[in-house]
Amino acid sequence: MADTTGRIPLWLIGTVAGIPVIGLVGVFFYGSYSGLGSSL
């Protein structure tokens, strides 16, 4: 696990990819809760 030279750390990928995913999921659930997500 220590051989990460020349490669992007997995936690960094998870963080960068996780933030927009959480945002999209939050917007989707908020939209569906507000009655706007049914159009999706």
Curated annotation (Swiss-Prot):
Which GO biological process annotations does it have? photosynthesis
**One Pfam family name from the record?**
PsbJ
Record has Transmembrane as a keyword: yes
Protein family according to the UniProt entry? Belongs to the PsbJ family.
- Subunit structure of this entry? PSII is composed of 1 copy each of membrane proteins PsbA, PsbB, PsbC, PsbD, PsbE, PsbF, PsbH, PsbI, PsbJ, PsbK, PsbL, PsbM, PsbT, PsbX, PsbY, PsbZ, Psb30/Ycf12, at least 3 peripheral proteins of the oxygen-evolving complex and a large number of cofactors. It forms dimeric complexes. Detected in both etioplasts and green leaves; PSII is only assembled in green leaves.
Q: Which PANTHER family match?
A: PHOTOSYSTEM II REACTION CENTER PROTEIN J
Write down what this protein is called: Photosystem II reaction center protein J
- Species this chain originates from: Hordeum vulgare
